[in-house]
Amino acid sequence: MKTIFLGLIHIYQRFISPLTPATCRFYPTCSEYTREAIVVYGPFKGTWLGIKRISKCHPLHKGGFDPVPLKKTKHKKDKNINK
């Protein structure tokens, strides 16, 4: 499933995006952000993050640097720490 989503983004970036004017207000671009989000979080959460990002990409938003959020890691508590 992840491969399909990434493939669709690749097709967009390779064949559709070059035909349109560069209007993305963010770095990385919205399509690159969505691609990175899918790689990090999987197809469903990554696509959701991409949709949220694209919804902010309009003239009333200032744009700027907006990277994919880091994935939170769960730390295991070391039970031997106080011994």
Swiss-Prot record:
Pfam families, alphabetized: YidD
Record localization: Cell membrane
Disulfide bonds: none
Keywords: Cell membrane, Membrane
A cellular component term, taken from the record's GO annotations: plasma membrane
Record's bilayer topology term: Peripheral membrane protein
PANTHER family listed in its UniProt record: MEMBRANE PROTEIN INSERTION EFFICIENCY FACTOR-RELATED (PTHR33383:SF1)
Function: Could be involved in insertion of integral membrane proteins into the membrane.
NCBIfam families assigned: membrane protein insertion efficiency factor YidD
Similarity comment: Belongs to the UPF0161 family.
Protein name: Putative membrane protein insertion efficiency factor
Organism: Staphylococcus saprophyticus subsp. saprophyticus (strain ATCC 15305 / DSM 20229 / NCIMB 8711 / NCTC 7292 / S-41)
Lineage: Bacteria, Bacillati, Bacillota, Bacilli, Bacillales
